Structure formats: structure tokens, C-alpha cells
From Swiss-Prot:
Disulfide bonds: none
Residue segments, region Disordered: 1-26
Biased composition (Basic and acidic residues): 1-24
Family designation: Belongs to the phage and mitochondrial RNA polymerase family.
Source taxonomy: Eukaryota, Viridiplantae, Streptophyta, Embryophyta, Tracheophyta
Compartments in which it is found: Mitochondrion
Task of the protein: DNA-dependent RNA polymerase catalyzes the transcription of DNA into RNA using the four ribonucleoside triphosphates as substrates.
Top-level enzyme category: transferase
UniProt organism field: Zea mays (Maize)
GO MF annotation list: DNA binding; DNA-directed RNA polymerase activity
Alphabetized UniProt keyword annotations: DNA-directed RNA polymerase, Mitochondrion, Nucleotidyltransferase, Plasmid, Transcription, Transferase
Protein name per its UniProtKB record: Probable DNA-directed RNA polymerase
Other notes: These complexes consist of double-stranded linear DNAs with proteins covalently attached to the 5'-termini.
Catalysis performed (reactions): RNA(n) + a ribonucleoside 5'-triphosphate = RNA(n+1) + diphosphate
Active site positions: D663, K750, D915
Length: 1098
């Protein structure tokens, strides 16, 4: 289907959502403590979010932050007036608009939900075939364009898009288009087919579940309209050919009809831009080629542009108004910015439901598509199959031939970013994907009923919005807001209309999201549900649509596990029951807040259980007060409901099927600690077990960094103090230590240093410091603090920076050879090719009417058009982050593969979200052991790095056919290369039982410096791309320097000792699963160490 750019799970980071919620809970707790000590809101201060929270807590208006915009000089009295204004606004709207006899709720989305409800278990007893039929029907209604489905779902939009008194889209395009191919496409359409295509595209782009996106780029909309029309044309031609073939046979089909007129998914808009770029290429120098090119609107508009013009002429969309930047001195406009975004002028709630939903039938296995190219012939990836050639998941994906079916690879640019697999060695990948997507779930009815019953209370504490907001009509609501604000003259001098408009629309959008989330839950109440799996080019798994564990806290609380159809009979003895209860209680406590050790979490939840039993009002009052400072309020509510149900019924299944969430402790730094074999990093990321006098506790790498930063600054200030004593006339500088201690904390340190892992530059670091210290320090102080932080990183994390530089330099070198950057795991190979993107500004003209007169308007469409040249700089700066993410992904796949090999694998549910793992309480204790072993299964760090060098330097050098290379390598060197190539096939170093033998083995896999130099010289002789010799030699020298420094450390006596410590900590020693002669697997119980383990934790 057309890519859901606003709701595909790759667009959101669930970890970031959790972090924001945790910080919100922490700040709310701080405000509650301030209230305890009697801290008041100032009478006139620059209002911020915490001030709004404080005012809300003081006045029992816990949802104030949703309705009061931050910023400006506003008092507590002003906030109170605005809060009353909103109450009046909602009441007025409900009385004057919603009670109007002409008002109707948008009903068109109910078609999808009613289909599910009508076939639910409480009305019929579905067979497998019936469930398959229901699933196929839902997919046809929500995922793909079917004209009849869209037409029937138009509802209140029918009069807007289909009006017999107005020109149809087909007639409009026939008037505007000039290209014969485009005209043929339009003529093949039905009377209202183009209108239905437009509605379908708008439904995909303007999505009620996209809380963070209200506008769509003009270029995106034009491109999607163009592509959708051509995909439908291809389908029409294919169907026509099938009919002719069935009636007349192959010989009677016209030869011209055997070739589709338009390539699948290719739009005229992008093609015209490329044509214009090619035309101008000769007149643009290499230097200016990277600057934005302004391209005038071409004379022959494409289908997408013409449909955009039709929408604008019907006043269904509008382009956002330009932004004028004013010169503060002259008070005149100095620049105009054209945003290039478009808004709908009708309620997007009225659009048909076009979003992927959970499945009620098990997803189809991923299979190599028969028409796909099975093998690729590239020396780097010989005999491997691209993941983009696999079809499966949704049932209809195997039935569609029009090119719009999703593939296993979630990337849009196949070939540019792809995964290639060996169909034999990569079986664990496909098996893990099958395990993940065949796991059944169901809706938590207890939580669903609780939320519906207590909706108004949840609104009052700021967790939900009023239900009626979702029914507000945009046009009527904004008209009422304007008139009501006009009546409140005093309020209109404090708050701008644009501010309040933004607040209102955000709340309407959020309310719509919540309402339809509950509608989805209601529709699936009586079904088992499944989530198809998709992988990105690094191997990380995703799900599509708005309802799965990648989503927000509300959605997560509504999903629980269900038994697989092939699950073995399961007996819960007393030990298993104790384990379920123990793990569930810890998980429940962590939904409330973080704890240093699990023991503290248990103490907290035991006290909470006493409250449940002793306070009759707990579920009517106390629990909602608790949610004010919760990390995950809805999941906390879910846990409390489950505990209450278990206490009443003694039914352990209530706890057993509730998911528990465990996150890897700073997984990127865990993987880095493994590559560096750094004991400190390993301990402070909880990857290595270490006890102290107080017992084991959860360590935090960012707290560790925070402490190290303070120590570094203390040492620096001592030096500066000594310098001051020697130079008494020197101007006193602001104390960096005092400033950082007063403003920084653990969360700020994380914000500063986590992106360092992914190539954050000193410039970006300085911008972050500027944002943090805005109004609290001058530019000199900001520069000084930024300099100290940057120096601290380079000094204290030098080895980490060296490894990052090594990966980046090799990537630069590989991309400079006009080859994809390749990085591997034992199961798959990732191909990454960043292309230069031309910044293009195109002019699009469209007609509209004003005062019954036609008016021609022009808007700008800003695009980034990929060119054919590799972007070497982007490859260099981006590869390390992708490299680490790939190792994360391998760890997740390896962990699921381990579970697949257990004899009771079908009974062990698992859901992976990047470096987060979800399972039943019964099996939560085994995941840390599996996670550690999965990291170890990546192989020895030096072998992984060597493989990266072989892919980009040594293999290309060996394969170089230049005559001068004939005797470049000696017999011994070629023999060494052959042996190393064999070593790369098995990245694990065997346990020799001797430190000396292990050390000799590690030293034997170090690539000699002389051999590297020969390979580099060989590659320079084969180069055709013009890269300066100076730059090339500089990159070569850096690679060799950093690699030799890395190998000297890893292969040293200390390095070997560190490797053995990591091996002893990570490898699952008593491991019959990995034996080649083992067929029965091992019991999951043997993996439970019976102790708290925090490498992944709640």
C-alpha cells in the first residue's frame, strides 16, 4: 500500500516516549514536593511547563498543561481565567452545535469496526476459514485501494468530493494534462475513480493516529497522488489482460498490452525534476551542484500536480501561508519562508479508515516472491537473496501483483538500503520472524472496561481528553473559538488566537486518537490478534499500524498475551506460581517509578497491595492520584487491576498473561563495552555482573558519566586556580563546575552524551548547551562549557572515539570506491548506499476561485531528489550508528532463535522492540541470560572488525585484476588471507582452556600493518573516482593508526584477560542448545539463575 509515512512504527521511538513520560512523572513528583513545602507560583514570571503543573496541582486542575500554552509573562490569575474560558467553550459548543438537529457524528469509519464486531466470537463460532475470510476483508478495506470500498466509506465527504454540479477530477485532468501517457491513464479511469484515489491518499497521509503530524509536504502529497493513480492503472491493465487471456488465450493479446505503460510506483513529478536536473547539469559546476536548484514549473503538469490543483480548486486543501521574518531594527520584512506544507480544510476524522490493523488470522510466512530476482551477482554478496524479495505477513500481500504489497524489508528505497541473506545460513532470521508474528495476543477486557467506566476521572488527572472533543468539527469549533475570545476582551490581550487555536486542535487530535484507539480495542475484544513483522535495513523489527507494543502507554495497557494453538500442556506448580507472582510484582512497581534494586520495588508494591485491601476507595480515588507521578500510568492501572482480580479469584492466569517489559540497560553502550572489552563500561551498563558490600544494584552509565564529568571539572578548576595564582591580573572566569552542577543532572548528561555515540559534532553539542543555558549564561560561558564537555568526552572516552573513527573512516573509504557500505552479522549482510540529494524547489500552479472569479495561484514544493552519486560524507558519519543498531538487531534475533530451540518454545511468548523485550512474568527471569549469550554469539570483537575491513579493503584488493598486482602479495600473505577468510566464517573463538593459547589465537587474527599497506596501494591503482591523493592517504593513515592501536589493546595480556572475563560473564556455559547433536533443546527453567540480573531490567 501507499506508505503510511505518519503511522509506520519506524517513525516513532518508543524509548523516547517512555523517557518523556518518566521525566514528566519526575517533574510532577518534584512539584508535589514543592507544594508540601509551601512553594507558591510567582505573581508575574516567565511561565514554563513546570509552572503550569504547579498551578494545576495547587488548584486540582491536573490536566492544565493540556490547555494552557507555556511562554509569556502570565500570572496564576491569567491561567485560572483561561481554564474557565475552556470550560465555557466546551459547554457552549456542546449546547449550541452538538445539540443542533443537523449535527451528525462521522460514521464512515464504523464500517471497519462493525465488520469485526458482527463476526466476533460472541455472535458466531468462527472456523479458521471464516477468520481467514474476515482478515482478507479487513485488509481489502484498510490497506489497499479498492474503488467500491472507498466510495461506500465516503460518508459526509461524499458531497465535498463528488458533486454533479462540479467538474469531476477526470474531466479536470483531461483539460489540464498534455502528455499522451498521462491522458491514457486518466481515460482508463471510471467516472469517480480519481476522486476515490484522492480520498484514499489523503486517508493515508492525514491520519487520526498521527499525534505529531498535522500537515503534509506538498511534494509528498503530489508524489503519492501520482503514484497511486499509476498503481491503479497498472491494476486495471493487469485485470484486463487476465480477462482477455482467460477468454482468448495468450495469442490474442495485443503485444502492446503485454507491457504496462507506466513503471510501478514511479511518479511523473520526480521524473520531471530529474529531467530538469539533467538539463541543467552541464551548466552547474561541481561546487554549486550541491546547492539548492530552483526549477520553474514545467509546462506539462503530471497527474499528481493536476490532482493537487483539483483539490485546491475545490477548496478541500490549502497551502500553509508564508512566514515573514522581520528585521528588528528596521521593523520591515527581510525574508519570506514558504513552508511547502498543506492542510486539509475539512475534518480528517471524516476520512475513511486506511491504516493497517492487527490480524485475526496468523500472518502468512515470508516467502521468496516467484517473480523476484532470487540471486544477485556482486563480489561482496555472492549468492545472497535481497530481503526486499520476500512477501508475506498480511494475507493479501501474496495475492496482489500491482507492486504495492509490503515486503519483509520495511525500507522504501530497495537496493539503496537492503538486507541480503543466505537462505540456508539465515534460517534463524526467518524462524525468529515467524515466532514473533505467530504469537497471539488479545485485548485486556478488564482494563478496557475500567477506562470506559472512569473516563471522566482520567480526563481530570490529565491522562485522557474529553470524549466529545473527538466529535468537534474543525470549522465550527474555530468559528466559536474566535467569537468567544472576542467577547473576552481581557483574555484576548493575554493569549493570542493562534496560540489557543493550536491548543484546541491538538486536544481535538489527541481526543480522536484516544477514541479510535478504544474503538480498535472494542472491535478486537473477542479475537486472538497477531502482528506481522517487518525488518529495516539494519535488521531491527517493526510492526505497522497504530495498535501494537511499539505504541504509547494507553495502547500497551490494552494488549495481553494469549496461548498459541500449538502450546504444550502447561502445569503451574508452586515454584512456577511464586516466580510468576514475584516477577509480576516487580514489573508493576516499575510502572509506577524506578528503583535501585528489585527489593525496593517489592517493598513498594507490597505496601500498595495493603492499600488496595484496606482502602475501599483505592480504585475510585487513590489509584488516580498515583498516576500523577507514574512512569507508565495506564500500565500501572492495568497491573493494579490484575492484582485485585488475582486477590479476589486466586486465578494466576490473570497475572500470567499480562506482559512484562524489560529494557536493555543502555544497549548501545553495552555493545560498545563489548567491542572495547572495557570492564568499567560493562559494569556500569550492567552487562558484567559485579557485587559490592551493599549487594548488586542497577547501575546507570549516565550517572557514571555524570560523576566522571564532575571529577574532570574539579581537576580542571584546580589547574585554572593555579594559573590564576601565577597570573593575578587575569580576568576571572565564571566557574564551569558551579554552573554545570547547578543546571546539569543525569537526564541532561544523557541528552548530551547519548548522541555522541551516533556522531554528534562539537557544533551540535554547542547548540544543545545554548538551548540549555538560554538566559542563564553569556556566549563566552556557553563556549567555555561546550569546550569542557567536548574535551571531557575525547579524553575520558578516547578508546570509544577511536572505534567510532575506525568504522567511519573505513566506511568513507568503501563508499569512495563506488561500492555499497557493507556490514555483516552471522545471519545477514546489510547494504547501505547513501546518495547525494539535490535540494529542489519546484513551482506548482493551481486554480482556485475568489469572488466567483478564477484565480491562478503558485506554491512551492521543496524536495530532496536522490542523485546517482554516492554521498561519501553521509556514509562516513552515519555508518557507525547503523553498525551498532545492526548488532542490537542481531542480539534480538539471536535471543528469539535461542527460545525457538527450547523444547517448550511454543509456550514462551516473546515480543522484541529494538533492545526492549516483552514476555510473560513466568519467563522474564530467563531473558537476561539469553540476552548476554546473544551478545556473545556476535563473535570476538576483533573478528567482527576484521570482517568490516575485509569487506571494504582486503577483498576488493585481492579481487583487483590490475596487472601490477600480480606479484604484490607473497605466498605467505595469500595463505594468511585465505586462513583469515576461513576464520571470518566462524566469529566465535573456541575455549582452548589456556590463556597462552587464547592469546596466541587472538594475535594470529590481527591483520599485519604491511599487508594493509599493500592492500591500500592496490586499491589506489584501481581507483577511477577523482579523490585527491592527499585526502586518500590521510584516510589510509588514520585507518591503519587506529586499527593498530585497537589491536594492540585487544591482543595484549590485559586485553586477553578482559576477553576471558567477558566470555565468562556472557556465554551460557551449560549450553546443550548449541551442540550440533542436540535435538531436544533444554528446559527454560534451567536458564533462570534465581537471582536479580539487571543487564536487561524492568
Amino acid at each position: 500500500p501507499i506508505r503510511e509515512s505518519v503511522r509506520v512504527s519506524t517513525d516513532r521511538d518508543p524509548d523516547l516516549e517512555d523517557e518523556k513520560r518518566e521525566q514528566l512523572g519526575e517533574s510532577m513528583q518534584t512539584e508535589l514536593e514543592r507544594l508540601t513545602w509551601g512553594v507558591e507560583v510567582g505573581t508575574s514570571e516567565d511561565i514554563n511547563v513546570d509552572t503550569v503543573k504547579r498551578w494545576g496541582l495547587q488548584n486540582n486542575k491536573y490536566n492544565a498543561e493540556h490547555w494552557i500554552p507555556p511562554g509569556g509573562q502570565r500570572t496564576a490569575e491569567d491561567m485560572g481565567k483561561l481554564y474557565q474560558f475552556w470550560d465555557e467553550f466546551i459547554e457552549t459548543y456542546e449546547n449550541e452545535v452538538m445539540m443542533n438537529s443537523g449535527y451528525r457524528e462521522p460514521l464512515n469509519k464504523d464500517k471497519v469496526f462493525n465488520t469485526l464486531l458482527d463476526h466476533s466470537n460472541n455472535k458466531t463460532n468462527q472456523t479458521a476459514e471464516e477468520l481467514k475470510g474476515i482478515q482478507t476483508k479487513i485488509e481489502r478495506m484498510t490497506m489497499y485501494f479498492y474503488e467500491a470500498n472507498v466510495y461506500e466509506s465516503l460518508g459526509q465527504l461524499k458531497n465535498k468530493f463528488i458533486n454533479i454540479d462540479e467538474q469531476t477530477a477526470k474531466d479536470y485532468l483531461l483539460d489540464k494534462l498534455e502528455k499522451p501517457d498521462d491522458l491514457d491513464i486518466v481515460r482508463a479511469m471510471g467516472t469517480y475513480t480519481l476522486e476515490c484515489i484522492v480520498v484514499f491518499v489523503l486517508s493515508k497521509q492525514f491520519n487520526v493516529f498521527a499525534l505529531d503530524k498535522a500537515s503534509v509536504q506538498v511534494a509528498t502529497l503530489v508524489s503519492e497522488l501520482d503514484s497511486a493513480a499509476k498503481i491503479e492503472y497498472n491494476r486495471i491493465i493487469a485485470e484486463d489482460r487476465k480477462r482477455k487471456k482467460a477468454k482468448w488465450g495468450d495469442k490474442q493479446i495485443n503485444e502492446d498490452e503485454n507491457i504496462l505503460l507506466q513503471d510501478k510506483g514511479v511518479d511523473t513529478f520526480n521524473g520531471d525534476v530529474h529531467s530538469e536536473l539533467d538539463r541543467k547539469k552541464k551548466s552547474i559546476s561541481k561546487q554549486t551542484n550541491r546547492k539548492r536548484v530552483r526549477i520553474s514549473k514545467h509546462k506539462e503538469p503530471g497527474i499528481g500536480e493536476a490532482l493537487f490543483g483539483w483539490l485546491a480548486s475545490r477548496k478541500l486543501i490549502e497551502v500553509k501561508k508564508p512566514v515573514f521574518l522581520f528585521d528588528k531594527k528596521n521593523k520591515k520584512p527581510k525574508n519570506v519562508i514558504y513552508p511547502g506544507y498543506v492542510d486539509c480544510l475539512f475534518d480528517i476524522k471524516d476520512l475513511p479508515f486506511c491504516s493497517t490493523l492487527p490480524m485475526v488470522y496468523p500472518p502468512a510466512d515470508w516467502e521468496l516472491w516467484p517473480t523476484a530476482t532470487a540471486e544477485v551477482s556482486d563480489p561482496y554478496i555472492t549468492n545472497l537473496t535481497p530481503l526486499s524479495s520476500y512477501r508475506g505477513g498480511y494475507l493479501t500481500s501474496l495475492q496482489r501483483e500491482s507492486g504495492d504489497s509490503p515486503t519483509l524489508l520495511s525500507e522504501k528505497d530497495y537496493g539503496v538500503f537492503d538486507i541480503h541473506i543466505d537462505r540456508e545460513r539465515s534460517q534463524p532470521v526467518l524462524s525468529a520472524v515467524k515466532k514473533l508474528q505467530w504469537q497471539p495476543y488479545r485485548i485486556n477486557k478488564l482494563v478496557y472496561d475500567f477506562i470506559q467506566k472512569h473516563w471522566s476521572v482520567l480526563v481530570s488527572v490529565g491522562l485522557l481528553r474529553p470524549k466529545n472533543l473527538a466529535l468537534f468539527k474543525r470549522k465550527e469549533a474555530l468559528r466559536l473559538l474566535s467569537s468567544l475570545l472576542f467577547k473576552h476582551e481581557e483574555l484576548s490581550t493575554i493569549y493570542r488566537y493562534s496560540e489557543l487555536k493550536s491548543v484546541l486542535l491538538k486536544n481535538i487530535h489527541a481526543s480522536t486518537f484516544e477514541l479510535y484507539t478504544m474503538k480498535i480495542a472494542e472491535a478486537y475484544l473477542d479475537y486472538k490478534i497477531y502482528f506481522p513483522i517487518f525488518l529495516d535495513f539494519r535488521g531491527r523489527n517493526y510492526r505497522h499500524g497504530p495498535f501494537h507494543f511499539h505504541e504509547r502507554d494507553l495502547v500497551r495497557s490494552l494488549i495481553i498475551f494469549d496461548e498459541s494453538d500449538d502450546s504444550a500442556a502447561h502445569t503451574i506448580n508452586s515454584d512456577v506460581g511464586d516466580r510468576i507472582l514475584h516477577n509480576f510484582l516487580i514489573s508493576a512497581a516499575y510502572h509506577k517509578s524506578k528503583f535501585g534494586v528489585y527489593r525496593e520495588a517489592l517493598e513498594f508494591i507490597y505496601n500498595k497491595i495493603e492499600d488496595m485491601q484496606s482502602k475501599p476507595t483505592f480504585f475510585e480515588k487513590d489509584i488516580f492520584v498515583d498516576t500523577l507521578c507514574c512512569r507508565h500510568p495506564f500500565q500501572y492501572i492495568s497491573s493494579c487491576i490484575s492484582l485485585k482480580t488475582y486477590a479476589d479469584t486466586k486465578d494466576l492466569s490473570v497475572l500470567r498473561y499480562t506482559p512484562v517489559f524489560q529494557d536493555a540497560s543502555a544497549s548501545a553502550y553495552q555493545i560498545m563495552s563489548y567491542f572495547l572489552l572495557d570492564i568499567d563500561y560493562g559494569i556500569h551498563t550492567n552487562l558484567l555482573k559485579k557485587t559490592n558490600t551493599d549487594g548488586r544494584y542497577i547501575r546507570d552509565i549516565y550517572e557514571f558519566m555524570w560523576g566522571c564529568l564532575i571529577k574532570y571539572l574539579i581537576a580542571e578548576e584546580k589547574i585554572e586556580l593555579a594559573i590564576k595564582l601565577l597570573t593575578p591580573n587575569e580576568k576571572d572566569q565564571e566557574s564551569v563546575l558551579a554552573k554545570i552542577v547547578s543546571i546539569f543532572d543525569r537526564n541532561v548528561v544523557k541528552k548530551m552524551f547519548m548522541p555522541m555515540m551516533y556522531g554528534k559534532t562539537d557544533y551540535t553539542l554547542k547548540k544543545d548547551v545554548e538551548d540549555l543555558l538560554k538566559g542563564k549564561s553569556d556566549s563566552e560561558g556557553i563556549n567555555l562549557i561546550s569546550k569542557h564537555i567536548s574535551t571531557y568526552w575525547k579524553v575520558n572516552f578516547g578508546k570509544m572515539k577511536d572505534l567510532m573513527d575506525l568504522i567511519n573512516y573505513v566506511s568513507w573509504f568503501g563508499a569512495g570506491q563506488d561500492k555499497p557500505v557493507v556490514y555483516s552479522t552471522p545471519y545477514w549482510v546489510t547494504l547501505q548506499t547513501y546518495k547525494w540529494r539535490k535540494r529542489v524547489k519546484m513551482k506548482i500552479q493551481y486554480e482556485t476561485t475568489k469572488n466567483n472569479e478564477k484565480e491562478v495561484k503558485t506554491t512551492s514544493a521543496k524536495m530532496l531528489i536522490p542523485l546517482n552519486d554516492n554521498d561519501i560524507r553521509k556514509s562516513s558519519t552515519s555508518t557507525f550508528a547503523n553498525f551498532i543498531h545492526q548488532k542490537d538487531a542481531f542480539t534480538a534475533i539471536q535471543l528469539v532463535d535461542f527460545i525457538n530451540k527450547l523444547e517448550n518454545a511454543s509456550s514462551i511468548p516473546i515480543y522484541a522492540v529494538h533492545d526492549n523485550f516483552i514476555t510473560m512474568p513466568e519467563y522474564a527471569s530467563i531473558l537476561p541470560t539469553l540476552y548476554r549469550d546473544s551478545i556473545f554469539r556476535m563473535g570476538h570483537p576483533l573478528i567482527i572488525i576484521n570482517k568490516f575491513l575485509f569487506d571494504h579493503i582486503l577483498i576488493p584488493a585481492i579481487q583487483n585484476e590490475h596487472p601490477q598486482n600480480k606479484h604484490l602479495f607473497s605466498v605467505e600473505e595469500r595463505s594468511m588471507l585465505d586462513r583469515m577468510m576461513i576464520d571470518l566464517q566462524n566469529p566465535l573463538i573456541p575455549d582452548f582452556g589456556s590463556v597462552d593459547i587464547t592469546k596466541a589465537r587472538i594475535k594470529s587474527i590481527v591483520i599485519p600493518k604491511d599487508l594493509l599497506l599493500k592492500c591500500f596501494s592496490c586499491l589506489w591503482m584501481s581507483k577511477t573516482k577523482k579523490i585527491s591523493l592527499v585526502r586518500w592517504e590521510s584516510c589510509r593513515d588514520k585507518i591503519i593508526k587506529v586499527y593498530m592501536r585497537y589491536t594492540d589493546d585487544i591482543s595484549s595480556d590485559e586485553g586477553v584477560s578482559r576477553w576471558l572475563e567477558y566470555k565468562n560473564n556472557l556465554e551460557f556455559a551449560s549450553d546443550p542448545v548449541w551442540s550440533s547433536d542436540n535435538t531436544n533443546g533444554t528446559q527454560a527453567d534451567s536458564l533462570d539463575k534465581g537471582e536479580d540480573d539487571y543487564c536487561i531490567h524492568y
